[in-house]
Amino acid sequence: MLPLHLVHVLYPIGLIANLFFGSAFTIQWFLSERRKKACVPKSFWILSSIGAVMMIAHGFIQSQFPIALLHGANLVIYFRNLNVSSSHSLSLRATLFILVVTLLLTTLPFVLGSYYYPNMQWMASPNIFHLPLPPPNIYWHIAGCIGLFTFSSRFFIQWCHLEINNRSTLPALFWLVSFIGGFLAFLYFIRTGDPVNIISYGCGLLPSLANLLIIYKKSRLPEFHNHSYFLSAGEPSGDILGSDLLHNIKTCDPTIRCFGVGGPLMRKEGFEPLIHMEEFQVSGFLEVFFSIFGLFKKYRRLYKAILQENPETVFCIDFPDFHFFLIKKLRKCGYKGKIIHYVCPSIWAWRPKRKKILEKYLDTLLLILPFEKDLFINSPLKTIYLGHPLVKTISNFQYCSSWKQQLSISDQPIVALFPGSRPGDIFRNLQVQIRAFLASSLAQSHQILVSSCNPKYDKNILDVLEKEGCRGKIISSTFRYQLMRDCDCALAKCGTIVLEAALNQTPTIVTCLLGPIDTFLAKYIFKILMPAYSLPNIITGSIIFPEFIGGKHDFNPEEVAAAIDILAKPKSKEKQKLACQQLLDTLMTNVVTPEECLRIICSQNSHLHLEKGILKNLHPRDSSV
């Protein structure tokens, strides 16, 4: 249709088009190798669309009708892949209409060209280097057409996959057809001496082979270890939840192997720790910053262990920031098992965008707070409200009246201090709590007992007591419920311990002294501004327990001491206890039973087969999985 010299001058358009195709497949291959699974970024379709437009022009210029026609059809499919996730997604009928119109518009110039130029070829052989090649016979042309149509049919396969699944992905059949069709076309263009298409189809064989290899390796992953669960709990509160979960799983099937990250309570249930929970005990920006290298090493060790062991289900218990990194890595590396997160991150308080991460990577989210269910009403993520496990744990707690004699504690009235579970928290909060006690009216009539969550932190507590010139005794956390029930009032660091105090109906004041950097981040960067910060106050929507939370300029020990004096009055104590009973009623409403929860989880996991008799024998101490 065009003069021969102009055809040769414009020949590089095809080369430039192949640069776009090559870039698209290079990006796709790189991301697939990185994520260990075949994936398709949006840039793949954009670059392919640009390349297709240029190849249509190349087909017109070089009088190669099959090239122009097939790239025209592919262009519509590229557009459909870009359009599928938009808010104005085209219907299948509209896409078919655009496809037919595109094919007609592509064919029309060749029909008109044949009318005005009877000698025009529809499949010319450029041979711009004038190689001494005889014209290919009819069989070569047939083989070439079969190769081209087979190669181009890959996107029709992908299109069908897209419309069925409503997801822009490249199935294994796409890559297989790409390789077979591309190989036939590659041989054909070698025979015709067409360098653009030799480069195009020759290079196209590489990503096809690479993706077929990735899919093959993924298919060769070992089957799930039928009696293997991975659990990870990085905090003491998570250790409590994890031990309850383990107890119910082991009651259901004692042969299941459970391994991962856990604390002393989980280890008592027969848990196999890869890393002890105590190694994760950091809080606040500075502590996390200086521990980042160690945390990264643990993260690498854990995800490699999971991929190697390939357990059927991964349970991540609280500790969301660390677990989010782990969950994302597992999915990117092709882990196909179920991922269940136990305890919803506080998206209702800050960083609400984490909800999208939960929906994208999780199979099930187990909730322990009653109001969290409302956050996922219109969400595709499966959620189960189990109720808080502390409710059943505390209701089944057997009080021992002789605990004071066992620990040689006098009958003097008690003020209980719960400074926290991490060294930094203990140092900051215990100072405030001791000073508040000494400034209160109870200093002369009461003794203070400090609850210690770990014996290795006892020296930290003794150092603070000595520094503040205060006599006090350290009580192991195993006696914390006896302590809560026998004390006149408690000062507790904001956290799970406050909810425990509320469920024990202990008159309590909440303290949480933050470091300067954490205070700045909370106030001005993350802007965590809420009417209340402790769980009892959040759940009930009222201030049951007075809160003193912030930096050193936000409150002082004298203010806390004034709150102690108010709380010491009988009417204040009774008011708190009544509110705590209302809190308990709220937590026990619409709770899913252990039987129901296990049945839901088992419906997702093939190896756990629950018999009615087994379910009836679940230990009564736990109302939450």
Swiss-Prot record:
A cellular component annotation (GO) from this entry: membrane
Lineage: Bacteria, Pseudomonadati, Chlamydiota, Chlamydiia, Chlamydiales
Keyword set, alphabetical order: Glycosyltransferase, Lipid A biosynthesis, Lipid biosynthesis, Lipid metabolism, Transferase
Family in the record: In the C-terminal section; belongs to the LpxB family.
NCBIfam families found in the cross-reference section: PRK01021.1 (NF002173)
GO biological process, one term: lipid A biosynthetic process
E.C. designation(s): 2.4.1.182
Record Pfam families: LAB_N (PF07578), LpxB (PF02684)
GO molecular function annotations of the record: lipid-A-disaccharide synthase activity; phospholipid binding
UniProt-annotated stretches for the region Lipid-A-disaccharide synthase: 225-625
SMART domains: LAB_N (SM01259)
Transmembrane segments: none
Protein's UniProt name: Lipid-A-disaccharide synthase
Known role: Condensation of UDP-2,3-diacylglucosamine and 2,3-diacylglucosamine-1-phosphate to form lipid A disaccharide, a precursor of lipid A, a phosphorylated glycolipid that anchors the lipopolysaccharide to the outer membrane of the cell.
